[in-house]
């Protein structure tokens, strides 16, 4: 569980203008809509587990800078890797992230998601603090999202 919290807490989300039709440009609203879409997908009893996983993967791939998150996870080791090793790592990290995300989030399909606050770090970067409230014996998960807005003027 600690790995999930660490992974989610350090996730880099990028607001992409191509997603502007679906998600709001306000970082707090964007994160709220994104998380609520994921919870809605996971709690849909008429959808198979495989389809739920594919839908969550799609949301993640469209909104998470997986490569940047992978490089962040590598730390200074990334500087020692050869290009082919880095390419293989990026491929495997994406598979790992998506599998972990879909399997762990399925336990929170009936949970409540709340945005608690946000702090604008720069014109393009905002930290959004949120919580997924656990049900029964599940612990709450505190998540800090780093939202990067490509074009804040729009």
Task: Report each predicted region and the residues it spans.
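Surface-exposed, charged secondary-structure patches
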Residues: 99-144
């Amino acid at each position: 569980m600690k790995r999930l919290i660490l992974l989610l807490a350090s996730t880099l989300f990028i607001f992409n203008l191509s997603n502007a039709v679906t998600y709001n440009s306000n970082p707090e609203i964007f994160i709220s809509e994104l998380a609520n879409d994921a919870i809605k997908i996971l709690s849909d009893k008429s959808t198979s587990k495989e389809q739920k996983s594919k839908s969550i993967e799609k949301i993640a791939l469209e909104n998470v800078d997986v490569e940047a998150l992978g490089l962040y996870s590598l730390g200074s080791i990334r500087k020692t890797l050869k290009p082919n090793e880095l390419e293989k790592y990026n491929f495997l990290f994406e598979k790992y992230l998506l599998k972990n995300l879909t399997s762990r989030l399925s336990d929170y399909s009936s949970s409540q998601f709340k945005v608690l606050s946000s702090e604008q770090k720069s014109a393009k970067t905002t930290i959004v603090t949120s919580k997924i409230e656990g049900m029964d014996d599940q612990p709450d998960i505190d998540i800090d999202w780093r939202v990067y807005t490509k074009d804040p003027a729009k």
